[in-house]
Amino acid sequence: MKTKKRMSIDESRRRFMAYFSSVGLGATLVPGILWGKMQETGSQQITLDMLTTSLKLGGVEFNAEERQAMVNTANQNLTRAVAMRSFHIPNDVTPPFHINAIVPGVIVNKTPQPFALGKVPALKVPGTLEDVAFWPVRHLSELLRTKQVSSVDLTKMYLERLHRYNGQLLNTVTFLDELAMTQAKAADAEIAQGKMRSPVHGIPWGCKDIISVKGYKTTWGSGAYKDQVFDYDASIVEQLREGGAVLIAKLTTGELAQGANWFGGMTRNPWNYGSSSGSSAGPGSATAAGCVGFAIGTETQGSILSPSATNGLAGLRPTFGRVSRYGAMTLGWTYDRLGPMCRYAEDCAMVMNVIAKPDGRDMSLSDIPFNWNPARYDIKKLKIGVTGLNSPNINPNAQKLMDVLKQLGATLTPLTIHPNNLPQFNEGFTYEQGAFFDELVRSGGVAKMTNPGRGNGFKSARLMNVVDFLQQSRLRMMMMTNLAKATAGFDAYFSAAGGGGGQRGAGARGAGARGATAEPPPTVPDTPPRGGRGGGGGGAAGGGTGNTNSAGYPGVHVVTSFSEPSTEAPVGSPQGITIYGPPFKESEILFIAKSFQDVAQLHTKKPVLKT
């Protein structure tokens, strides 16, 4: 073989693979010219004549033995690729590898402790039942326990509000009136006998519409799937049903868990109808509007924290491996999480009591007990880290949080997370979503999407090299280890640096519709998102929570102030801070958020709703 014009078979294979990756056919080993000839003839196999002609056009030479070897190898790979793609892979089948948020340096409490709730004042039902629509789940549960109100009454009230306000808010895809009333009646019968299945027994709730409910449409927010029905419930639906909660609606998601736009329009934020945040847009909007007791959202890159920020909620993104994803649409097997979106931090703990447990289906789950009892915690003894504590440019919302925590006796400790000079880690889900939606792309289903441009990310996954993906995963592990070392010994932390109320909303399972932006400087942890306009994109929670998100850390958003009232936002828009914790420290960060809320009482503020 000539040294200048010819190449080894191994080198040619690499070049063939690189070329076919660029045209979305990375599983094959044939050059572009050869592929064109195959298309012209309709052949599924390469012939020696095809290869010989293509090599001449390409200006390279191989001897007969080398050409035949190339034909054999290419045809073998083509046959394997065709065979692999002929299989339909069910949605619930995951790759046989999982990440674990517990890396060297992470210490977790594996001792189960009794679950207990904080004390509440004596409660009495107002003259009009609808006045409790914005009450914390903690208070609603007490009304049910003391039999001052029935689950049927609460369910009817919340369903009526969902129907009344949905025309403006567009936060509901499917109303589950009949199912809800059946579950509410069953809850009342058990509560009347003194049987409380869980802290959320009898509480009406809604789930994001990427979570399957047997026999009902699960649309994923997309025109390509708007008639999709599964014959099984997601684990989280089963768990909450077993806990006696009452499912009343499938709530909107941005198309395929991105942004706030779906096939029915753009879901609205009740504080400001001109803005929104996703992709858990419906859960955020419905909870903030007092149309459900609580909701379940999902997050890959910001889709719980960002809409919680925009809608003024105490939304919890649990530790990766804490809550089952079985039955929920996948964007990233090593990123996706499900969690509660509530008005009050302790409400999140009540929901977590039911859903934070292994289910035997999602093999990424860790059997770490979720322990909640506010009486066990002392704010003075928790180690709370603050990055940028001595910054000349303090985020005013961080300052409000710090002022209250200091008032309660907390000690705030400066925390430094050193630069690691490693690449960004928030693009890894692109590979994973490309695999999950591979059949959609190959079948031409992208054309049926409400926004076909959303499918470009799925297609681009085929431009990526599997070696790069694995190397990026190793770098991700380095980042996780560095973060674990930096936060070792801390119970919680947040960022004080920055001048605003947070960042705008984000990409996949984040606020905007154009995708995520860059990660903030690695010297500080993620600054909390405020959420962006649906369809707007911007720095989102997608980019803004990158390190803690990729590391699997929990976070809870808490409202610390409201902007000045305006024409668009009659009572102002919520602003706040996200409190993060090391893996499986949900109870600690929820306790800190609850402690702030109990003083500030901002969670009792209500938006002005339109009909």
Description of each model-found segment:
Residues 2-182, 403, 407-408, 605-611:
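An N-terminal boundary/leader segment
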Residues 118-131, 200-220, 378-387, 427-484, ...:
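Short helix-loop capping/hinge segments that flank enzyme active sites or metal/cofactor-binding pockets
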Residues 118-123, 317-398, 598-611:
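A short helix-breaking turn/cap at a secondary-structure junction
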Residues 139-146, 225-228, 336-343, 459-464, ...:
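Short, well-ordered beta-strand elements within core beta-sheets of diverse protein domains
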Residues 147, 202, 242, 246-248, ...:
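Glycine-rich, small-residue loops and helix-cap segments
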Residues 148, 155-156, 185, 393-416, ...:
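Acyltransferase
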